[in-house]
Amino acid sequence: MAQYLCLNQEETKQLLDAYEIDTIGAFTFYRRKHIQTFFKEADHVLDQDHPMTEQFTYSEEVLIDDVYTGKINVEHILYTLYSHETREENPHVRIMEQPYEMSLILDSFNHLSSDMPITHLFCLDNSQKQTKNHEFYNLQCLNNLLPVILRNKNYHPYYYYSNVSIMNEHDVFYPNVMITTRYVFTYTNDHSQGILYKTPQIVNAFKEKFDAYIKEASCFMTRESWVDNLTDIQTFFNTQTITRELMTTPCPTYVFEESDLAIMRKSLKDFFPDKEGFIKQFHDFANYWNQEFYTRYSDLFHIIYTVQGLRYTAKTGYLHDIPPELFNPLSLEDRLLLITKWKEFCKKHPYIMMADMPYLSETSTTYFQLSDQVFHMIAADSTGTLANISIQEVTLVEAFNDFFENVIKKNAYSKEEEIKLIDECIEMIKKEM
């Protein structure tokens, strides 16, 4: 039809988009677009270093009960309250504000302390109404809060549902609140005005009401630090029902045998922390994977990797599993062995699928794992420790499941095409040898 109508590339795209919107609905169409953007930007959020401020000047400002006007003054009070709270014996900050507006403030807080217990209550949308920018509001909240939970292991977000689009259309009387040990600060959505209270009875009343709300709310996401990387991953597989895993490059853990451990040993840089301990973990996990886990769950556990990641490993020798700062690239001989074994692994298992996902960086060291109830992102935090971030909110889990199904339907290669592309990489390596 596009050829018949003499449409250019952009007009053809608009026609195809209009057809898809008519087929699946605008909400699902734009939701998939936003999730694609999420994967494109995920490594920027998850893999970036989060430097902490070594020293800062604690505010000695004496706060008084008053009305504060102007965004600069309101945000100065928020920052000062947090600064004061860091010096309390049992610090705890309670916040009720939408992540859409609050993320920059939370991020700046963590320059003062990455250990501050923060309980954050906010509202998510359950309306499926499109905003004027076709935004997926709940995903935007996730984007804003990921850097916070990566930096602060004591950050605990909770949510309740309401129609956010209706809420945003009406002015609400001082809807936001920050509660510390000694103070309560209520303020407007635009941070133009706030009221500070420090009467103990008022502070305690706000704490009691906030804690009552938390009991009725649901956990948005959790963070679990994995210090013993592969051992913790094995425990994770034993306790979670994972149905899909998304990664970029071939994974040596799934195909290397005991005779291949020398490859990993020479590839890990000399300063790799507890190098021999990691090699032992690698060996133990490979045995667990091949002899226990995948023999039982190969029909349930679907692995998606990308053609971009395959080519990246073939060309560079780098892997998805280990950050390049800690890893010497595989030699041509070792690349050939890995990709040849990966080919046999893929031929044997129909649920190992290669997909074309150019928006997901081939250098990504982040794993994405999904079940029917939880979406997991496994990434390095600011200390280099693996952090398993688990999102449990229903609309987001549903959205990621839908996105993965669509990737498999539209962007996954057939098994014959997959093997052909792997063979091309094998031939490329052989020509360089």
Description of each model-found segment:
Residues Q3-T53:
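Short amphipathic recognition helices of helix-turn-helix/homeodomain-type DNA-binding modules
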Residues M1, L5-Q9, L15, Q201-F206, ...:
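Generic hydrophobic secondary-structure signal
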Residues F38-E75:
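The feature captures two recurrent sequence modes
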Residues M1-N8, Y19, V177, D321-I322, ...:
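Aromatic-residue detector
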Residues I64-E417, L421-C425, I429-K430:
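Hydrophobic protein-protein interaction segments
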